[in-house]
């Protein structure tokens, strides 16, 4: 008779779950942040799809004039959007159970809050998951730091700006044309083009695109040939190979002669840090600028700052921007008020003299 003695498993279900969640052997890493990220992003995505297709019109301005945003109510992919919550709701937390009925919740734009708040929690957790996986693999945390730039930008337009303006109705609509409308209104009310933080963001995005194109083209132009003329040079690279796949000395020499010597990096590590840091810092500044303008600390205003010897205004580009801002503000919420605040603040003579 043979007796087989097996060691009793000491791990319970919770320990097995913890091991599975934190295991780096999974095809997709879950992580503790992923435990919260997955349901929140699924909720936001599901609600967005349903609302984009079939949500009824929303009384965004709080004046009983609903605005349609879904496909089934006359929009297409370009004009469709999830319309922000009503100005009548303001900054109040507005879950489904706070409304008297589902129809009221939809009429006041409840789906917008549901989507935005779940989405922000989800992207915060995605950033934490990036750090968590880097930690498990013994990597440095800069991937999560870089991702913090778009997270900060999304937080600025979806949360900080509505808080500063006093209502979720001022948040960015969830759609293509809604995004452009948000940009135009933001320019009209805050003169963002004349804000130095936005200008730093433009330099970061366009500069990052330029540097990325320059780096990619230099590397591609200085590959070390490992193949014949009839084969693609891409076949000369083997995943995980120890030797360099391109000649950094040749790329450095080319670029140094094209511009000047010190414009070219001779250190691959500092080069790639620069490529990551430039756009990230620029987008950080943009998010910070939007957060500042949310509380009406706006861009520079040089309106009528130059006059000639006779006191006549010498028109500048700033004056062109100011006129454009007034025009855009007149078009914005045209049924809520007849004139922008700049014009409505002018003292008007009484219509009836007593």
UniProtKB/Swiss-Prot annotation:
Binding site for chlorophyll a PD1: 198
UniProt binding sites for [CaMn4O5] cluster: 170, 189, 332-333, 342, 344
Binding site residues for pheophytin a: 126
Gene3D superfamilies given in the database record: Photosystem II protein D1-like
A Pfam family: Photo_RC
Entry protein name: Photosystem II protein D1 3
One cellular-component annotation, GO: photosystem II
Propeptide segment residues: 345-354
Site feature location: Stabilizes free radical intermediate: 190
Membrane spanning residue stretches: 29-46, 118-133, 142-156, 197-218, 274-288
NCBIfam families per record: psbA (TIGR01151)
Record note on cofactor: The D1/D2 heterodimer binds P680, chlorophylls that are the primary electron donor of PSII, and subsequent electron acceptors. It shares a non-heme iron and each subunit binds pheophytin, quinone, additional chlorophylls, carotenoids and lipids. D1 provides most of the ligands for the Mn4-Ca-O5 cluster of the oxygen-evolving complex (OEC). There is also a Cl(-1) ion associated with D1 and D2, which is required for oxygen evolution. The PSII complex binds additional chlorophylls, carotenoids and specific lipids.
Function: Photosystem II (PSII) is a light-driven water:plastoquinone oxidoreductase that uses light energy to abstract electrons from H(2)O, generating O(2) and a proton gradient subsequently used for ATP formation. It consists of a core antenna complex that captures photons, and an electron transfer chain that converts photonic excitation into a charge separation. The D1/D2 (PsbA/PsbD) reaction center heterodimer binds P680, the primary electron donor of PSII as well as several subsequent electron acceptors.
GO terms of molecular function: chlorophyll binding; electron transporter, transferring electrons within the cyclic electron transport pathway of photosynthesis activity; iron ion binding; oxidoreductase activity, acting on diphenols and related substances as donors, oxygen as acceptor; oxygen evolving activity
Binding site for Fe cation: 215, 272
Catalytic activity: 2 a plastoquinone + 4 hnu + 2 H2O = 2 a plastoquinol + O2
GO biological process terms on file: photosynthetic electron transport in photosystem II; response to herbicide
Site (Cleavage): 344-345
Stored InterPro entries: D1/D2, Photo_II_D1/D2_sf, Photo_RC_L/M, Photo_RC_L/M_CS, PSII_D1
Organism from which the protein derives: Synechococcus sp. (strain JA-3-3Ab) (Cyanobacteria bacterium Yellowstone A-Prime)
Subcellular location: Cellular thylakoid membrane
Gene: psbA3
Keywords attached to this entry: Calcium, Chlorophyll, Chromophore, Electron transport, Herbicide resistance, Iron, Magnesium, Manganese, Membrane, Metal-binding, Oxidoreductase, Photosynthesis, Photosystem II, Thylakoid, Transmembrane, Transmembrane helix, Transport
Subunit field text: PSII is composed of 1 copy each of membrane proteins PsbA, PsbB, PsbC, PsbD, PsbE, PsbF, PsbH, PsbI, PsbJ, PsbK, PsbL, PsbM, PsbT, PsbX, PsbY, PsbZ, Psb30/Ycf12, peripheral proteins PsbO, CyanoQ (PsbQ), PsbU, PsbV and a large number of cofactors. It forms dimeric complexes.
Note from the entry: Cyanobacteria usually contain more than 2 copies of the psbA gene.
CDD domains: Photosystem-II_D1 (cd09289)
Site, as annotated: Tyrosine radical intermediate: 161
Chain residues that bind chlorophyll a ChlzD1: 118
């Amino acid at each position: 008779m043979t007796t087989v003695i097996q060691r009793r498993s000491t791990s319970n279900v919770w320990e097995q779950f913890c091991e599975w969640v934190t295991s780096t052997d999974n095809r997709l890493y879950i992580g503790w942040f992923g435990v919260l990220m997955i349901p929140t992003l699924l909720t936001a995505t599901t609600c967005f799809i349903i609302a984009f297709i079939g949500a009824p019109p929303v009384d965004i301005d709080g004046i009983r004039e609903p605005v349609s945003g879904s496909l089934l109510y006359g929009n297409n992919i370009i004009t469709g959007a999830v319309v922000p919550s009503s100005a009548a709701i303001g900054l109040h937390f507005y879950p489904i159970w706070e409304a008297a009925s589902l129809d009221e919740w939809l009429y006041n734009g409840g789906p917008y809050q549901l989507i935005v708040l779940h989405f922000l929690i989800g992207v915060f957790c995605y950033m934490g998951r990036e750090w968590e996986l880097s930690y498990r693999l013994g990597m440095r945390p800069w991937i999560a730091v870089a991702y913090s730039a778009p997270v900060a930008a999304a937080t600025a337009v979806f949360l900080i700006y509505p808080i500063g303006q006093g209502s979720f109705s001022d948040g960015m609509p969830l759609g293509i044309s809604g995004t452009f409308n948000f940009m135009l209104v933001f320019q009209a009310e805050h003169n963002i083009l004349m804000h130095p933080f936005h200008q730093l963001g433009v330099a970061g995005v366009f500069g990052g695109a330029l540097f990325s194109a320059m780096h990619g083209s230099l590397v591609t132009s200085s590959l070390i040939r490992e193949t014949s003329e009839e084969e693609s040079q891409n076949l000369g690279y083997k995943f995980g190979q120890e030797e360099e796949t391109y000649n950094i000395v040749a790329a450095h020499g080319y670029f140094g002669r094209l511009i000047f010597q010190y414009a070219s990096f001779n250190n691959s590590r500092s080069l790639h840090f620069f490529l990551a840091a430039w756009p990230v810092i620029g987008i950080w500044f943009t998010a910070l600028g939007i957060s500042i303008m949310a509380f009406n600390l706006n861009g520079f205003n040089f309106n009528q700052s130059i006059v000639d010897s006779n006191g006549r205004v010498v028109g500048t580009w700033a004056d062109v921007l100011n006129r454009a801002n007034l025009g855009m503000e007149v078009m914005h919420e045209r049924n809520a008020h007849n004139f922008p605040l700049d014009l409505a603040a002018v003292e008007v003579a009484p219509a009836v003299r007593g």
